[in-house]
Amino acid sequence: MSATIISGSLIASKFREELKQRVKILSETWMQPGLAVILAGDNPASCVYVRNKAKTCEELGIRSEIFNFPGDISQKALLQQIQDLNVNPEIHGILVQLPLPGHIRIDEVIAAIAIGKDVDGFHPCNVGALVTGHALFHPCTPFGVMKMLAEYDIPLQGQHAVIIGRSNIVGKPMALMLLEKGATVTVCTSRTRDLASHTRNADIVVMAAGKANLLTSDMIRTGATVIDVGINRLADGRLCGDVEFSGVKEKAGYITPVPGGVGPMTIVMLMNNTIEAAERAKAVALAGGWHSSVQ
């Protein structure tokens, strides 16, 4: 058998059309949604990600502002920029591109973002609300994964999902979202002893370990759904995920490719969250309140 390929690119294209309509309505009846992206330093990968986000904003009709700071920016200056954006009524979403320079206290920076503009879903209040199933915004990558699973009608209720990776960005929120849908969730890391004993029992495997080709075909059960969040660059310059794609696709039931899998959905979910933030701000403004942010 050969797995059905879950194309994030195709699903993202479908969502983009829906998002364009929502942006059009907002722009015609209120104001253009606005996203601010803060970049500190010249990390090549971060620069590429920020350009891709700006390009997607332009395609959808979202106003984007990129604040590109040198790598030696002070904590105080960075926090002041965030506070300025928090009270800017034309900015509805604020994203701080990670990683930040080593001298910056990341937790303090993320916590400074107004909750109603935290379109990455990383603010401590949003993370806490995610535990109860009432997050204002869902972190973009796991949110995109959930949309992909839903698009292909992959059942979650009662299914055993194994996540490899425990990051605050993917692994932990992914576990909470799957739990919310009734899955039985096991969280592992790349250092979990006898990792294969866990993955072989999984109906769904989500790879987010950041280790190239970690999951091989002998580590999954026949027909399993395999979601590859990892993106790694090999010595020859090629991109690959955490899954040994050519072998695993011959045994899995569903699988995401790298590139063209989860990546496009992450950006689309960021756009969705930005539009949602603008829609909420509009509702508050029309009700006679201040539409800038929720502090």
UniProtKB/Swiss-Prot annotation:
| Alphabetically ordered keywords of this record | Amino-acid biosynthesis, Histidine biosynthesis, Hydrolase, Methionine biosynthesis, Multifunctional enzyme, NADP, One-carbon metabolism, Oxidoreductase, Purine biosynthesis
Task: Check the record and name the PROSITE patterns matching this protein.
Answer: THF_DHG_CYH_2 (PS00767)
Q: Name one GO cellular component term.
A: cytosol
Q: Does the keyword Iron apply?
A: no
Q: Which EC number(s) does the record attach to this protein?
A: 1.5.1.5, 3.5.4.9
Q: Give the InterPro entries listed for this entry.
A: Aminoacid_DH-like_N_sf (IPR046346), NAD(P)-bd_dom_sf (IPR036291), THF_DH/CycHdrlase (IPR000672), THF_DH/CycHdrlase_cat_dom (IPR020630), THF_DH/CycHdrlase_CS (IPR020867), THF_DH/CycHdrlase_NAD-bd_dom (IPR020631)
Gene for this chain? folD
How would you summarize the oligomeric state and partners of this protein? Answer: Homodimer.
GO molecular function annotations of the record: methenyltetrahydrofolate cyclohydrolase activity; methylenetetrahydrofolate dehydrogenase (NADP+) activity
Q: What Pfam families would the database entry show?
A: THF_DHG_CYH (PF00763), THF_DHG_CYH_C (PF02882)
Species of origin reads Nitrosomonas europaea (strain ATCC 19718 / CIP 103999 / KCTC 2705 / NBRC 14298)
Q: What is the protein's name according to its record?
A: Bifunctional protein FolD
As for family, the record states:
Belongs to the tetrahydrofolate dehydrogenase/cyclohydrolase family.
CDD domains, per database record: NAD_bind_m-THF_DH_Cyclohyd
Q: In which pathway does it act?
A: One-carbon metabolism; tetrahydrofolate interconversion
Q: Which domain of life is it from?
A: Bacteria
State if Hydrolase is listed as a keyword. Answer: yes
Q: Name one GO biological process term.
A: tetrahydrofolate interconversion
Q: What does this protein do?
A: Catalyzes the oxidation of 5,10-methylenetetrahydrofolate to 5,10-methenyltetrahydrofolate and then the hydrolysis of 5,10-methenyltetrahydrofolate to 10-formyltetrahydrofolate.
User: Reaction catalysed by this chain?
Assistant: (6R)-5,10-methylene-5,6,7,8-tetrahydrofolate + NADP(+) = (6R)-5,10-methenyltetrahydrofolate + NADPH; (6R)-5,10-methenyltetrahydrofolate + H2O = (6R)-10-formyltetrahydrofolate + H(+)
- Residue numbers binding NADP(+): G165, R166, S167, S190, I231
Lineage, top ranks:
Bacteria, Pseudomonadati, Pseudomonadota, Betaproteobacteria, Nitrosomonadales
